[in-house]
Amino acid sequence: MENHSSSLNLKEIYDFLDKLAPFSICDSYDNVGILVGEKTHKVKKILIALDATVPVVEQAIDEGFDLVLCHHPVIFHPLKNLSPNNPAVKLSINNKCMLALHTNFDCADYGTTDIMVSLLGLKSEGILNVEFPQQNKGYGRICTLSESISPLSLAEKVKQAYNCQKVRLLSGKTDIKKIALASGGSGSEIKNAINHGCDAFIGGDIKHDQWIDALNYGITVIDAGHFPTENIFCAYMKKVLSEKFPQAEFVISKNSVEPFIFV
């Protein structure tokens, strides 16, 4: 039985997450792991968000959180100055830690896309894009429905599953049975979905030329947005970490919200 009064080091959380979604299996451009703070830092209160925005960081400071855990890195591009308004700098000067699981979690078993699959009530049949063949890891998943569905009906299911205000829909094949899914900015996976013979692709941040490719090949595409397809990270992390470390407090930030509204 775990001791609820025992202290917790950031290293313990890091090591657990490294087994869940190995930090070594990520895109070369990415920046994952502990980005602010040290492994020896004591943590008791952990704030979870998609992004370490200024409102999220200020909540962490104001409410006494020790660690901000996010999907997106707080330091992605090199810092050219140390402005106190920069979230990473703000965390550091207030002695807070920040840890990110980005593309390592996107391609992990039970990562973002597997959560997408589960929320739609589907089962994954394979990886859409095996980016890391030695570890058999990659981006996107392929699923087959028990019965065919129309593009509009699938779009409505997607809206409900990912709590989307709106989705963008390109109706290609009208009888959809084989589906590819990928989280976040995933329009580049549409061609992989086409090559796998999928009837539909569900993702986010689809670019204009990617819509045109989909139109030309006749595949249905549903753009559920970057935030809705990845904010699902937060609830999953709270669940697994609370179960593993009951001596700590895990809270989803009230400020982990989409940065824009539809008008």
Could you describe each region identified by the protein language model?
Residues 1-263:
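Active-site catalytic microenvironments in core metabolic enzymes, especially phosphate/sugar-handling
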